[in-house]
Amino acid sequence: MAAAVTAAVSFPSTKSTPLSTRTSSVITHEKINFNKVPLYYRNVSVGGKVGTIRAVASDVEAPVAKVEKHSKKMEEGVIVNKYKPKNPYTGRCLLNTKITGDDAPGETWHMVFSHEGEIPYREGQSVGVIPEGIDKNGKPHKLRLYSIASRPLGDFGDSKTVSLCVKRLIYTNDNGEIVKGVCSNFLCDLKPGSEVVLTGPVGKEMLMPKDPNATIIMLATGTGIAPFRSFLWKMFFEKHDDYKFNGLAWLFLGVPTSSSLLYKEEFEKMKEKAPENFRLDFAVSREQTNEKGEKMYIQTRMAQYDRELWELLKKDNTYVYMCGLKGMEKGIDDIMVSLAAEDGIDWFDYKKQLKKAEQWNVEVY
């Protein structure tokens, strides 16, 4: 507990003392108890002059100043958890279309839901979906979170819709049984006009940086592209009175086949529109290899620009965002460990500093 101190100070003379003599101070004190209140009398010698300080210490707690955190991200006015599982929002499916080719390993769907302006989300946030039906215990299904794939204005430009990018989950378990993901199959099977129960918006980890001159490196695998579609629309397809992107956006997207490249045409139009501000690199693991004949995963593609990426990471206005499969983290760390070591830096310590500075942002599953 901090103690509040009140003090009365008296000096025998107000005559000024030359600076040359103000070289030291000596304090002595004697504690006196009076009416159970501790008093402190102190003789203070400053530059040859002696004065007395009488101080009373009390148990009153001194106010502690609250240190405000000033985020580098677009956090001002951000809304989270407007709709919770116990009080969700019911919207409707307006559009649901498959966006992967027939030869792709798995289906991915782009869907648009109405929210009539009731879910005011930002780029980088997520919404929850509560699928219809009950689980094996007879209870309602729990919500699943999905990164939002649309800009706040929505795909229709009226601020009344939210879009998701969802891969249908189907796999064979250890017993040889085919298992279907509850929420992903519910969403991929939705017909226009069907109701969908939503929660949110949630999340601040993946919000865009405020700095319009920043370097923003986006690392995505598969449906992890969702938040970056939202980012890039804001940067290159929209006009804002208070924001014009003049920095560098660099997207790395890793997928298994060419027919799995999500929103490819949109990104290529952005690159054509702003070639000086947008770099685009795909890594197609089942179709491409590097000069060593190794499969082209996202970290393999990044390794081709390793020194350039490392130099960018040394800048205080470079922000990295990673979204998608958790497995890509190790491969990216492996690249950075050796690069940092060349400069005598421990990568994992440096990454902690980047995270603390909001320059390394991860959302993986």
Swiss-Prot record:
SUPFAM superfamilies: Ferredoxin reductase-like, C-terminal NADP-linked domain, Riboflavin synthase domain-like. Residues 11-22 have a biased composition (Polar residues). GO terms for biological process: photosynthesis. This is Ferredoxin--NADP reductase, chloroplastic. Its main location: plastid. NADP(+) binds at residues 147, 167, 223, 255-256, 285-286, 295, 324-325, 363. Belongs to the ferredoxin--NADP reductase type 1 family. It comes from Mesembryanthemum crystallinum. InterPro entries: FAD-bd_FR_type (IPR017927), Flavoprot_Pyr_Nucl_cyt_Rdtase (IPR001709), FNR (IPR015701), FNR_nucleotide-bd (IPR039261), FNR_plant_Cyanobacteria (IPR035442), OxRdtase_FAD/NAD-bd (IPR001433), Riboflavin_synthase-like_b-brl (IPR017938). GO terms for cellular component: chloroplast stroma; chloroplast thylakoid membrane. Pathway: Energy metabolism; photosynthesis. Residues 1-22 are annotated as: Disordered. It catalyses: 2 reduced [2Fe-2S]-[ferredoxin] + NADP(+) + H(+) = 2 oxidized [2Fe-2S]-[ferredoxin] + NADPH. FAD binds at residues 144-147, 165-167, 171, 182-184, 223. Residues 86-208 form the FAD-binding FR-type domain. Keywords: Chloroplast, Electron transport, FAD, Flavoprotein, Membrane, NADP, Oxidoreductase, Photosynthesis, Plastid, Thylakoid, Transit peptide, Transport. It is found in: Plastid, Chloroplast stroma; Plastid, Chloroplast thylakoid membrane. Its EC number is 1.18.1.2. It comes from the Eukaryota. The gene is PETH. It is a peripheral membrane protein. May play a key role in regulating the relative amounts of cyclic and non-cyclic electron flow to meet the demands of the plant for ATP and reducing power.
